Amino acid sequence: MLIASGPFGMLAGLPLHPLLVHSAVVLVPLVAIGALVMSYLPSFSRRHGKLILILALIAQVSVFLAKMSGEAFSEILDKNVGKHAELGEIAPLVTLPMVALIYLRWRMDRAGSSIGNVVIRRLTSVALVVSSLASLVMIFLV
């Protein structure tokens, strides 16, 4: 039986990476789409922003776990997985700004919030769109 070192190697004889990567592949695009809607519909942000934020945090953790398990998984593979590994290294850094901007946008759109003027809100929306699209592209490239 192949066993990679560390806590991210194997579970019950199965490599963890293929199992963990599915949460990132599902959650990051889902969160990115939610973030895109949040950036243009404050009412959506008020109603669903907290859920999107929670999912974004779970997605961020899943991207990190997929990265860590991928490192352990590469130790047991014979073939070269260099490009995939390189992209996996930077994936958490690409998705993190989206999480921060979702939090900021949600806080701005909450009832009674006085955070940010119109220009700041629009710039936040633009940054959220860019970071969401970057996260989508990164997840599909990895």
Regions found by a protein language model. Give the residues of each.
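Polytopic transmembrane helical bundles with strong interfacial aromatic enrichment
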Residues: 1-142
